[in-house]
Amino acid sequence: FAIYGMENQTLPEKYMPLRILGYDGASYRSQLQKKRKRPVAVLTIVLYFGTDKMWDKPTHLKDVIYIPEGLGEYVNDYKITVFNIAWLTEEEIARFKSDFKIVANFFVYKRKNKDYVSDDKTEIKHVDEVLKLLSAMTGDERYEEILAEKEKGEYNTMDTVAEHLVNMGEARLGKLINLLLQNNRIEDVKKASVDKEARKKFYKEFGIID
C-alpha cells in the first residue's frame, strides 16, 4: 500500500512544490521514526477548485528555488500532481464512484456558468463532508448553515441544497431591504439589489451574516 494525501486549493500558489515536499518529507520521516521494515511510498496530490483559470503556477521544485550555476544537475527535482477539478472531462468525472463525482460536476458547471444552480438529483451519501467541502472551496458559508439546521435526510441531493440556498438568499435579501427602508436608505436598497459585494457588506453591517 501507499500513503496518500490531498491538499485542497482555491487559488494557485507559487511555492506549492515546497509545501508538498515538506508534507511528504514529514511523512517519510515519521515512517523512519516508527522503524518500518521498509517505508512505503507517499503521494500528496493537489485538488485545485478554482473556476476562473487553470493552475498556472510551478509544479516542479527546481522552478521555485535558486540554484547556483553549475549545480543544476546535482539538485534533485520534485514534481507535484495537480488536478484542475473544474476542467475535468465527462469521461474523467464518470470514473468517480464516490460523492466526489457530485462535487466535481458542481465545479465544472460553475466554471461554465458563475450563476449555476445545481439540478443534480444524485443522492449524496456523506452530506456533512460534501457541504463542508463546498463551503470551504466556494467561500459560501450558507452550506455550513444548512448543516446546522438540516433534518436527517432533508438535504441529500444537490438540487435540494440549491433550492434551500435560493430560499435563504431571498429571505436574507428581504430582511435586508426592510432594514434599509426602516433607516430611509433608499440608495442602498438599489445597491443591495444589484451589487453582490455591497449586499454582503450590508448583511454584515446589520448582523444578518457574521
Where are these regions (language model features)?
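Accessory alpha/beta interaction modules
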Residues: 1-96, 164, 196-204, 208-210
